[in-house]
Amino acid sequence: MNIVHFGSDDIENSLANMSDQDLNQLAFGAIQLDASGKVLQYNAAEEGITGRDPKSVIGKNFFEDVAPCTKSQEFQGRFKEGVANGNLATMFEYVFDYQMKPTKVKVHMKKALVDDSYWIFVKRL
């Protein structure tokens, strides 16, 4: 497996052909969403950060059902703006606190190379 670095400019190239098993071996959280925010993939590292089983979140709306603490201009607003412009590519710090101890993270959002989907990468700080 290739090493994938959090925050790298070409991270979406590395993920384009990754299997679910490879995705689960990443050292940071990786969540793939469609344009509406529906969860398509949710890796094991993200489960470790949030305590949520990937099987329980696949198909749910990330902003409404999985992480309502992200339903803010700072998080969901950036996602929607990037989706609307077709060029989602942003990085910022955030605090996840929905049904968990407040956890400061770095978030990296990128448009996927394949399909009409988007990645949210999460690393604890």
Curated annotation (Swiss-Prot):
InterPro entries recorded: PAS, PAS-like_dom_sf, PAS_fold, PYP
A Pfam family that the UniProt record links to this protein: PAS
Keywords: Chromophore, Photoreceptor protein, Receptor, Sensory transduction
An MF annotation (GO) of this entry: photoreceptor activity
Protein name: Photoactive yellow protein
Post-translational modification note: The 4-hydroxycinnamic acid (p-coumaric acid) chromophore is covalently bound via a thioester linkage.
Family per record: Belongs to the photoactive yellow protein family.
Residues modified as S-(4-hydroxycinnamyl)cysteine: 69
Parts of the chain that traverse the membrane: none
GO biological process terms, semicolon-separated: phototransduction; regulation of DNA-templated transcription
SUPFAM superfamilies in UniProt: PYP-like sensor domain (PAS domain)
Gene source species: Halochromatium salexigens (Chromatium salexigens)
Domain PAS: 23-86
Function: Photoactive blue light protein. Probably functions as a photoreceptor for a negative phototaxis response.
Chain's gene name: pyp
